[in-house]
């Protein structure tokens, strides 16, 4: 008999079947899942349990529902839960009811998820649990069925719901509470291993403790107490509560992944988790502690399979607590404050942080943490302060902390403090002593626990030694002939020397390039490519942010520790007996000095192999170096040196990356890696990508000796002018260091110790077996060449170097087309044919172009695929029309700034003529374009881009489009920001970007309002409020794991997801980013389509792709891999006249396409007709291909990878590739393989729905109005929909200021007043959350405490993080402090606040900021416009300011004093701030305490000079 499944059960069955098929096909990895959330804690400061703590914890959890995600069924959440003390009375009463006498001491309770479907498995699990508890001699009172209400959860959640029971355990042995907890921890770990040994799934212990218990599951936050009625019982009392609402990137309901975990709840993402997990494998082999005794092996592996990043952090946190450290100390060890962050860090704190960094690699990434070990309750923040953590302290002795303020309703008269945690900070309650510790006091307490300052003196700092050696002179030992041979052996060219090496030596910076990478990926190239070419850099997007390695250098570190790392569970002075360097990059003199210092503690390993050693020579050599290294370490070597110096005619170098990966992995598997450092001397290294790969696979230090010999040889030839050789070497080292920081920062990683060995790359074209053996931290989705293939290539190249009499370096052609070099997609003949076709409107010529592209040897993965169909061809006339197909085309985001105004406008006109869409790119759009010309031509971009710089993003701009695109990343430089040099910022561009002509503009690497997936959901929400008609696109760049990110984006209510390939164009980018970051769109697109289909989300979103599409064949293949829409960027530029000279970044484009120079712009010959011809030809070719395959529309082939198959191209290295993972099919069930949603994915209404209805007299009669409402933190983007209506009815500046006033009482949710326009005034009596005044476009916002509040405004936080991001006009007055990144990228708003957190006024380009109080670290970083005034009572600003781009001085000019005073007066009028009024009351004295902060680039542009001679530097 078959039982019919309900929808939830059917989804679960389909998901499991499809996921298994994809996993088998190597197309999907469940470990790619990400999550984010709302998190918080409540604690009774006196440590006494109260019912109110539980009630307020539940209330707070229900108030962060919008930070989680909800399934389409409206009932299945991504997970929510609460962690409280075990209510002893509740469980002792239960013990009595079941016939036992309740003990006097504490009961322990295990909250257990048991398998529900298999009763045999369920009983087996109970048996294991009981056996392990009894083995430790503890008494079991019995099992308790936890009462639950299954009616309120969704069918999907119910289909995966476990059986939920509690086991009640007595401490009949009478051991101490600490010993009982330790035993219960060991028992739980033994149970987990035993259940796993029985291969039973769906078993999980939420908690097993006498101190605390966790109730969690896959329901919505507001359903917690309905699902678990236990929590409504008055006997449920606690001294703390930790709560969590989860947002996951997949839709499969997994109950154990709900948080809180056993000791912590985490909002954010650990960017370094791959490296941390790898290093824990290395550390745990040495982990011993008396507390665990003989049970140590029961606790390993510490990090189990399938854990999330938060779960992994929790397991490490737990083992370190159980080994005797307190929760605050473990937080310091795992997620430490940045040691380099501030000159204001006390010395005792610095010693503590240095100790922590010596013992552990930091777990780095956005993290708001709520933690408990049963005694301590701790709130903590990551080193960058990338998540919000607000707290409130009340008169009745409660502290309430969490992701938002206002989660719990508190009478303002009972609030004694409102604060926030800044970067690296903590706040904690010691429940045992009943004491609250703020950050400084807590770290002072930790600093007294051990003599950290003495211990850290054991570390030997080598820098002085190695730098002294370098200053004495850099050796140059190699003759020119040997230099040339070695360069040739590694495939180096003149292009490498001149285009890559020379700028690094001359300027200390990486080489910059432009346009995209149109050369073949390494495995498809017929030229020799070093092994580093097979590794593509990973980067952050959406689920965690990249960081700015230039402007936020203070939180980053290349500090490198060398030696024996010891046992991380110890706490003694031996752990700091290490060597330390400031950077892992060493010149030859430095390396030799370090080697001499190491003496007998170092062992050198020859990393070469005989050229005549037979087909297994390389494999044998790898076996040898692994064994020699193991023997050396077992023999006591604490430093290993791998070197290829022995190469010569008879011996070839093992690629250093392969040697390093092999040795690093072998040492981990042999339990030896933490005993030694792994130092590499290689002739192969040249650019920053190479160093990053080498360190990423495990190298401790690197010396690229051949690069140094090349520099010396070029220096002898006088190619660096009068520059001393040592200066050139120092510049090269600086360029590599800065490049490493940039590559780390793309992943959001701040510390190289957490990057090392993390394998933050994807291998493209290397065999899975090779990668699994030597680079197990990486993925290789499409396989490729193995050791034999590598050996063959290495020996062929080696022969060209050593079998010839004289060796001259080849010219090259990897970066720019050369006849003797690598093939390029846009060769001269191809460009010429395409331009001929569009100029002459000749489809015949276009077909010749298409044949040129399609018939050449493979260059891209799609070139290895052929189309196939079993259907009979149909007449072309029956296929969907050219007009319909053309509407699927897009010209991708190219800004006015990158493009000339003529080129930008031509694309817009052309795309509008054919009903397609052009993308404005970053940088705003001229309002003159918003209305068609007299001849009907429409110069307006149909897609408006919202990028990280938010240049020109106003309410008007956002309302003049059909689509809004959030550019998270760019194909040519994912994980990076950008900058428009001053010489490109013309009068027109400055006007559009709300900046100053001639002044450089910086786009940050991340969106400062997208640090996680729920932040993206909030931005999408904001954009759908400001434009109620436009669809929202999210632009991602292809990388492994992008499928799960896209699933999260779809759940965030995006309408379109754009997958950009690595070969897309750019106006300017580091060459190593263009060449080595991101993946081909074929890989990302197919993965996204597969995972969206797997999660039953595909029919809700449209998929778009771009990045090197050239022909109709490319478009059809893209459709079969899942795309519905297609971006054609470079080809459209070529149609307008681009000839690919790759000078976009230098403002010298000879054909007027990518240039702002007036004379060169006149050379532009592009026309809308040429662009229209291109898209017409592409559409016609698509029709012909579809007809030949027997299909009548593109929709019929979308997602039909069965119509593609991989074909042999007759080359062994190509046939090793396996594209089948990209062609794997997912059964879509009842849904289509493409988007069937009409309209857009709508978001819930905000308070504005009521406001707009109540404001009818304004819109109908133009009446001046005042409206009043109560506000809650769940009401987001208040005023934004109103702004949209005002903009559309009256224009952005059509109303007088204050025409409509909205008065709010309470706590405003995120994005208060986002994009508010002139005429709107928002007054809040209470406080507000993050993103206040985002994109403010002329409106006024006032935030002040209620009149009944006893708080001193200047000492309390009133608004959140990232205030006035991208604001272009308007005013903000806040009577209190702002959070981190206050006024980031402010372009024109005026603001007065009473203090701010770190990174204030970062990237500011306009407007005026007055800060009546202390600022945080790194103030004014990257500030190039506007002005700031800082009230400084203790002359501390010089310690906090980043003065690279600004000067600061006391106010010397009456004009500026008057401006400042007027703004403070206005602030007092609006907020009634007593503190600001006191400043005005003694103005003559108080004005002397202000600093005036002015960007250097603005000094000669100010109408009123600031008396520069008085300016001082932070130094």
UniProtKB/Swiss-Prot annotation:
Residues 926-936 have a biased composition (Basic and acidic residues). Its cofactor is [3Fe-4S] cluster; FAD; FMN. Pfam families: GATase_2, Glu_syn_central, Glu_synthase, GXGXG. Residues 37-432 form the Glutamine amidotransferase type-2 domain. Gene3D superfamilies: Aldolase class I, Glutamate synthase, alpha subunit, C-terminal domain, Glutamine Phosphoribosylpyrophosphate, subunit 1, domain 1. Binds 1 [3Fe-4S] cluster. One of its GO terms (molecular function) is metal ion binding. Glutamine binds to the large subunit and transfers the amido group to 2-oxo-glutamate that apparently binds to the small subunit. This is Glutamate synthase [NADPH] large chain. It comes from Azospirillum brasilense. The gene is gltB.
């Amino acid at each position: 008999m078959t039982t019919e499944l309900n929808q939830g059960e059917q989804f679960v069955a389909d998901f499991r079947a499809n996921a298994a098929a994809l996993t088998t096909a190597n197309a999907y990895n469940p470990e790619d899942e990400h999550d984010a959330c709302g998190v918080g804690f409540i604690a009774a400061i006196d440590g006494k349990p109260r019912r109110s703590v539980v009630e307020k914890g539940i209330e707070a959890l229900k108030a962060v529902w919008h930070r989680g995600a909800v399934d389409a069924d409206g009932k299945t959440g991504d997970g929510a839960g609460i962690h409280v003390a075990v209510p002893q009375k509740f469980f002792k009463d239960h013990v009595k009811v079941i016939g036992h006498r309740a003990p006097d001491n504490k009961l322990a309770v295990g909250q257990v998820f048991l398998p529900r479907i298999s009763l045999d498995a369920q009983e087996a699990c109970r048996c294991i649990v009981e056996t392990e508890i009894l083995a430790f001699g503890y008494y079991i009172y019995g099992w308790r069925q936890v009462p639950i209400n299954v009616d309120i959860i969704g069918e999907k959640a119910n289909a995966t719901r476990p059986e939920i029971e509690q086991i009640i355990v007595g401490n009949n042995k009478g051991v101490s509470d600490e010993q009982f907890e330790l035993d219960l921890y060991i028992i739980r770990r033994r149970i987990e291993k035993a259940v796993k040994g029985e291969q039973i799934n769906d078993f999980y212990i939420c908690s097993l403790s006498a101190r605390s218990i966790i109730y969690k599951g896959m329901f919505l936050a507001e359903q917690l107490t309905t699902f678990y009625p236990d929590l409504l019982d008055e006997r449920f009392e606690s001294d703390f509560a930790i709560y969590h609402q989860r947002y996951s990137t997949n839709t499969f309901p997994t109950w154990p992944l709900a948080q809180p975990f056993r000791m912590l709840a985490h909002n954010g993402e650990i960017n370094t988790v791959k490296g941390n997990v790898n290093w824990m494998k290395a550390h745990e082999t040495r982990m011993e502690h008396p507390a665990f005794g003989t049970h140590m092996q029961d606790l390993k592996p510490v990090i189990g399979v399938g854990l999330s990043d938060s779960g992994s952090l929790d397991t490490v946190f737990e083992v370190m607590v159980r080994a005797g450290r307190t929760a605050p100390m473990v937080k310091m060890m795992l997620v430490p404050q940045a040691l380099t962050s501030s000159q204001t860090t006390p010395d005792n704190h610095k010693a503590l942080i240095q100790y922590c960094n010596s013992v552990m690699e930091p777990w780095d990434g956005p993290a708001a943490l709520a933690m408990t070990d049963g005694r301590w309750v701790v709130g903590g923040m990551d080193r960058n302060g990338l998540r919000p953590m607000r707290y409130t302290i009340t008169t009745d002795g409660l502290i309430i902390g969490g992701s938002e303020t206002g989660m719990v309703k508190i009478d303002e008269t009972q609030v004694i403090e409102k604060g926030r945690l800044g970067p690296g900070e903590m706040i904690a309650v010691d429940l045992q002593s009943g004491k609250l510790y703020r950050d400084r006091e807590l770290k002072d307490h930790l600093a007294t626990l051990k003599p950290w300052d003495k211990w850290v003196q054991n570390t030997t700092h080598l820098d002085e030694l190695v730098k002294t050696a370098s200053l004495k002179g850099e050796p140059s030992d190699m003759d020119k002939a040997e230099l040339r041979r070695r360069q040739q052996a590694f495939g180096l060219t003149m292009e490498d020397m001149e285009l890559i090496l020379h700028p690094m030596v001359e300027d200390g910076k990486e080489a910059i390039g432009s346009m995209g990478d149109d050369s073949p990926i390494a495995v498809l190239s017929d030229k020799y490519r070093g092994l580093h070419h097979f590794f593509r850099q990973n980067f952050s997007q959406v689920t965690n942010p990249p960081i700015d390695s230039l402007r936020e250098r203070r939180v980053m570190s290349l500090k490198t520790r060398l030696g024996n790392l010891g046992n991380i569970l110890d706490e003694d002075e031996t752990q700091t007996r290490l060597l330390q360097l400031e950077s892992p990059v060493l010149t030859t003199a430095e390396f030799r000095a370090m080697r001499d210092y190491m003496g007998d503690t170092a062992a050198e390993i020859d990393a070469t192999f005989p050229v005549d050693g037979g087909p297994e020579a390389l494999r044998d050599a790898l076996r040898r170096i692994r064994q020699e290294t193991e023997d050396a370490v077992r023999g006591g070597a604490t430093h290993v040196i791998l070197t290829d110096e022995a190469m010569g005619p008879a011996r070839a170098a093992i690629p250093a990356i392969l040697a390093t990966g092999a040795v690093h992995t072998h040492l981990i598997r042999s339990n030896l890696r933490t005993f030694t450092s792994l130092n590499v001397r290689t002739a192969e290294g040249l650019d920053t990508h190479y160093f990053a790969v080498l360190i990423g696979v495990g190298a401790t230090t690197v010396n690229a000796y051949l690069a140094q010999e090349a520099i010396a040889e070029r220096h002898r030839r006088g190619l660096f002018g009068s520059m001393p050789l040592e200066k050139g070497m120092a510049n090269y080292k600086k360029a590599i260091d800065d490049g490493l920081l940039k590559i780390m920062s793309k992943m959001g990683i701040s510390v190289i110790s957490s990057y090392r060995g993390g394998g933050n790359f994807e291998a493209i074209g290397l065999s899975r077996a090779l990668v699994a053996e030597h680079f197990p931290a990486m993925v290789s989705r499409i396989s490729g060449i193995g050791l034999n293939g590598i050996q063959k290539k290495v020996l062929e190249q080696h022969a060209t170097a050593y079998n010839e009499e004289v060796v001259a370096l080849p010219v090259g052609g990897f970066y720019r087309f050369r006849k003797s070099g690598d093939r390029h997609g846009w060769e001269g003949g191809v460009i010429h044919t395409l331009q001929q076709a569009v100029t002459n409107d000749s489809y015949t010529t276009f077909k010749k172009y298409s044949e040129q592209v399609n018939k050449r040897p493979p260059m891209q993965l799609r070139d290895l695929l052929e189309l196939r169909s079993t259907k009979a061809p149909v007449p072309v006339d029956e296929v969907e029309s050219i007009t319909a197909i053309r509407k699927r085309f897009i010209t991708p985001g190219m800004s006015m700034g990158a493009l000339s105004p003529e080129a930008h406008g031509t694309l817009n006109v052309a795309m509008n003529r054919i009903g397609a869409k052009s993308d404005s790119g970053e940088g705003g759009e001229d309002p003159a374009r918003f209305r068609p010309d007299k001849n009907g031509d429409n110069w307006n971009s149909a897609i408006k881009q919202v990028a990280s710089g938010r240049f020109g993003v106003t309410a008007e701009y956002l309302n003049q489009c059909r689509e809004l695109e959030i550019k998270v990343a760019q194909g040519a430089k994912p994980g990076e920001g950008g900058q428009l040099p001053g010489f490109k910022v013309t009068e027109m561009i400055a006007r559009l970007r709300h900046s100053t002509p001639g002044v450089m503009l910086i786009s940050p690497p991340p969106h400062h309002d997208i640090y996680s997936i729920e932040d993206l959901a909030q931005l999408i929400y904001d954009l759908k409020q400001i434009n109620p008609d436009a669809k929202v696109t999210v632009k991602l760049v292809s990388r492994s794991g992008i499928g799960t990110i896209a699933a999260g984006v779809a759940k965030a209510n995006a309408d379109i997801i754009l997958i950009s390939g690595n070969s897309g164009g750019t106006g300017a980018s580091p060459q190593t980013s263009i060449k080595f970051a991101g993946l081909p769109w074929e890989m990302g697109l197919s993965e996204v389509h597969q995972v969206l289909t797997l999660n039953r989300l595909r029919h809700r979103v449209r998929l778009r792709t771009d990045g090197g599409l050239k022909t109709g064949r490319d478009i059809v293949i893209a459709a079969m891999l899942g795309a519905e829409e297609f971006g054609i960027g470079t080809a459209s530029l070529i149609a307008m006249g681009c000839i690919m000279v790759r000078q976009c970044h230098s403002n010298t484009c000879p054909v007027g396409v990518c240039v702002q120079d007036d004379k060169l712009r006149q050379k532009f010959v592009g026309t809308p007709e040429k662009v229209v011809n291109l898209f017409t030809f592409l559409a016609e070719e698509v029709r012909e291909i579809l007809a030949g395959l027997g299909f009548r529309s593109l929709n019929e082939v979308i997602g039909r990878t069965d119509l593609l198959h991989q074909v042999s191209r007759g080359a062994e290295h190509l046939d090793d590739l396996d594209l089948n993972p990209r062609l794997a099919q997912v059964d879509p069930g009842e849904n289509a393989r493409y988007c069937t949603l009409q309209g857009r994915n709508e978001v819930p209404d905000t308070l504005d729905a009521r406001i707009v209805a109540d404001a009818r007299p304004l819109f109908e009669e133009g009446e001046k109005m005042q409206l009043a409402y109560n506000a809650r933190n769940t009401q987001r983007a208040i005023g934004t929909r109103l702004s949209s209506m005002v903009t559309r009815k009256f224009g952005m500046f059509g109303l007088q200021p204050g025409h409509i006033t909205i008065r709010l009482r309470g706590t405003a949710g995120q994005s208060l007043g986002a994009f508010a326009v002139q005429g709107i005034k928002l007054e809040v009596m209470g406080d507000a959350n993050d993103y206040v005044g985002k994109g403010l476009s002329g409106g006024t916002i006032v935030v002040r405490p209620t009149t009944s509040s006893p708080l001193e405004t200047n000492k309390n936080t009133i608004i959140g993080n990232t205030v006035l991001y991208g604001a272009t006009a308007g005013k903000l007055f806040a009577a209190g402090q702002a959070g981190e990144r206050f006024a980031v990228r402010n372009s024109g708003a005026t603001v007065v606040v009473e203090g701010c957190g770190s990174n204030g006024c970062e990237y500011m380009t306009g407007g005026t900021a007055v800060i009546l109080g202390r600022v945080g670290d790194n103030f004014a970083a990257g500030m190039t416009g506007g002005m700031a005034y800082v009230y400084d009572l203790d002359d501390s600003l010089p310690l906090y300011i980043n003065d690279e781009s600004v000067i600061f001085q006391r106010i010397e000019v009456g004009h500026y004093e008057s401006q400042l005073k007027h703004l403070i007066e206005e602030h007092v009028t609006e907020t009634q701030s007593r503190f600001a009024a006191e400043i005005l009351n003694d103005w003559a004295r108080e004005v002397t305490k202000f600093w005036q902060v002015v960007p250097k680039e603005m000094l000669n542009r100010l109408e009123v000079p600031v008396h520069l001679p008085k300016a001082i530097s932070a130094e």
